[in-house]
């Protein structure tokens, strides 16, 4: 299945719009990961732990989006938008949502 942030796919023609699809992932941050990420933030540098969690959440959201598109009979999703939010008490959770339009392309 093709996934793209653009409204179409070069060289392909959209023959049917199947509907809007979305996928979400909400992940809690581990207290020890938070502690070490906080130390890294104090001394400078990137937090590899948070980067991995962001990537994991994005992958889950896109997999859900793809499965929902497949369930509608689509073979592509166009116009994908990915949003990131922090949730929960003291921003202890990360939510990634992905949405787009499921289509059939030829």
UniProtKB/Swiss-Prot annotation:
**InterPro entries, A to Z:** UPF0145_dom_sf, UPF0145_YbjQ-like
Domain of life the protein comes from: Bacteria
The cross-references to Pfam families, in alphabetical order and at most eight, read: YbjQ_1
NCBIfam families membership? PRK02877.1 (NF002776)
Q: What family does this chain come from, according to its entry?
A: Belongs to the UPF0145 family.
- The name of this protein is UPF0145 protein Nmul_A0734
